[in-house]
Swiss-Prot record:
Species this chain originates from: Arabidopsis thaliana
Location of region: Type E motif: 774-850
Principal location: mitochondrion
Keyword Transit peptide: yes
Cell location: Mitochondrion
Gene for this chain: PCMP-E90
Protein name as catalogued: Pentatricopeptide repeat-containing protein At3g02330, mitochondrial
PPR repeat start and end residues: 47-81, 82-112, 113-143, 144-178, 179-213, 214-244, 245-279, 280-314, 346-380, 381-415, 416-446, 447-481, 482-515, 516-550, 567-601, 602-636, 637-667, 668-702, 703-738, 739-769
GO cellular component terms, semicolon-separated: mitochondrion
Alphabetical UniProt keywords: Mitochondrion, mRNA processing, Repeat, Transit peptide
Amino acid sequence: MAESLRLLHMTRSVVSFNRCLTEKISYRRVPSFSYFTDFLNQVNSVSTTNFSFVFKECAKQGALELGKQAHAHMIISGFRPTTFVLNCLLQVYTNSRDFVSASMVFDKMPLRDVVSWNKMINGYSKSNDMFKANSFFNMMPVRDVVSWNSMLSGYLQNGESLKSIEVFVDMGREGIEFDGRTFAIILKVCSFLEDTSLGMQIHGIVVRVGCDTDVVAASALLDMYAKGKRFVESLRVFQGIPEKNSVSWSAIIAGCVQNNLLSLALKFFKEMQKVNAGVSQSIYASVLRSCAALSELRLGGQLHAHALKSDFAADGIVRTATLDMYAKCDNMQDAQILFDNSENLNRQSYNAMITGYSQEEHGFKALLLFHRLMSSGLGFDEISLSGVFRACALVKGLSEGLQIYGLAIKSSLSLDVCVANAAIDMYGKCQALAEAFRVFDEMRRRDAVSWNAIIAAHEQNGKGYETLFLFVSMLRSRIEPDEFTFGSILKACTGGSLGYGMEIHSSIVKSGMASNSSVGCSLIDMYSKCGMIEEAEKIHSRFFQRANVSGTMEELEKMHNKRLQEMCVSWNSIISGYVMKEQSEDAQMLFTRMMEMGITPDKFTYATVLDTCANLASAGLGKQIHAQVIKKELQSDVYICSTLVDMYSKCGDLHDSRLMFEKSLRRDFVTWNAMICGYAHHGKGEEAIQLFERMILENIKPNHVTFISILRACAHMGLIDKGLEYFYMMKRDYGLDPQLPHYSNMVDILGKSGKVKRALELIREMPFEADDVIWRTLLGVCTIHRNNVEVAEEATAALLRLDPQDSSAYTLLSNVYADAGMWEKVSDLRRNMRGFKLKKEPGCSWVELKDELHVFLVGDKAHPRWEEIYEELGLIYSEMKPFDDSSFVRGVEVEEEDQWCYC
């Protein structure tokens, strides 16, 4: 009785020990050897069960040191291990790649069975040493199916697929009976070789030997068909599996994802949950990828919660898929929380975050994460580089991009097509076109994305003809253009190349891509910007006519939302087209129609309509749009804010304009330019200069537009020295070559300060021909400062060479002659104007009262209250006449005088 109780106690202790040891090793808390020896001393016994269990756990968890200590204790204790125990010990050494120790154990084994040989073959196969594996295989006295499977798997893992096929053929010749694992391996070979026909032959063998109901073989079959883009066969195999397990469910869900049948993947996942098949690591990863691609944040979040409960959340593959899901569902906040709370982060986790922040246009955060990745010692790969190049493009970080491309060259990853494509895109967006073309030129292999990247780079940098040339080169290289190609090439045609655009439209129709939503929007944009609004509206109406669609309510809702987004882009293009044609009223009417149709405007719509309000000085409508912007919480957008600043200033409301400027959370050079331009336009030169100086202090780099505004402010104030300082600052401090508008402002500054001849010299020193604006500016200042008749005549002659029908040139010169008392020349000019049938451009004024726009032209009697208006103007003119020296209208015919004064 006492002996029985002792044995029972010892058995319970062994079970307890085994359980504790499993927990410690599985949680990476590898116990010290004393834990093992203390137990043996307590039970005062060593057995096959103890050592085999320890060796199995050490092999499973890679605890090599504990395995070695247990091996030493086994020798010291004098325990004579069985073949089974020694096979378990072999597994410890082969799993940890310690083949010296493994060979010693194998050589000293008194009795080897087929399992012993298989352990050595499998170990060498996994270590990419197929020579040694083959040597052991050939020396085996007896081989079983496991031995052959190890060789099959080894050759596959080492990329020697043809060798795997040879082994499979030899198995058949030797009469070895195939099992499910054999078929699983050889079908993986078919997938690797992309040889679906061979896979179908293997399928025939599977059916013939009766393995078609084997879940392992069937799962491999459906995986092979899915990867070979024959999903119908894959689905048929799945439906034929009598008892589906987590492996088969995982294979079919992964197949759906591989074939972009993402909704079906989610459907299978829900069905799997109903039958309680159990969720594996690969299922979590596949379904999370589907959620990411479909922006299914709600389901993705639920799956993450499920993973947390089942302890799968700590798995590296599942964690990376979860991070990627949150990032692609625009939820970087939860992605960052998961990232920060994760232990043992791997490179894939960093890649998911870098890519996510790059896609969310948080370039600086992505760059910081890449720096952390570099510091972590995990290294980088092609995905890391592609993501960080996008980040460099976002922040216009050319210097960072150059350094990172240096890393790509050093690591030979610059040869990767995806990395090269990302680098081309980055250089293009950073305006380093030469570098972009160099990377493109050095590529050994180019795909459609490579051509799209270099074409887009040239289009973004205003190289329209080069873009068209590259498009032709792409076609000659037999690369089929896609929606991204046509998007870039049609943008290149918006600069006036309508003929090319129409030819490309024909190519689009022939290629069958006219129904593509992205291409349709690009066509609408191209025709709108080329001034062919009617053609753009035709395409818009034809493209977005209602179509009969079917699907679930959820799918229909998504399709509807996507279509509304596409329609918004299309409407934006047409509205922008009207603005470019200076038809702001039509643009506003189109915006009203858009709202009536229930299409939600985006920030680009609001910005464009605010531009029309600025053009028409429609402060009322502008304020209504501003209210909508606040309601949709878009006021923090830098683009919207800049447009609001510009709109209020052009409507004469400098107070609200400055208020919007100061409230702006982020100001770029456009915001600063809008405010400075507003002050300059309203003659507030001092405020404009103060704001410009503040802009410099805040390290905002001014551009050409900034200097146009600040020079205009100097012209208003007559600040010749300050104007010259800013003019020379452009090239000296910022590398900006002055353009025609800058010279025009300098002519105005010099002329208004009385230095008319110096202004003429500046025009002659210009590196390019003066335009009509500059000559008209010079002629205008001649009317202010007398005794500059010769300069005025030269300016008039230049203006008439540019446009012989320019009536303003005659009018201004007439005023110069009148101021100089040269009445005969005034009369001659008036006769010439009548002889050439030239008429003064009628003056035009407008005012907005109670949301209604009133427009007035000289001599206009179309307004319903024109009689009251003319009566009031007559009273004002009669009060002005006694104080007017009439020098302005000398030389004008008497019957025209009153009409001129009503302008």
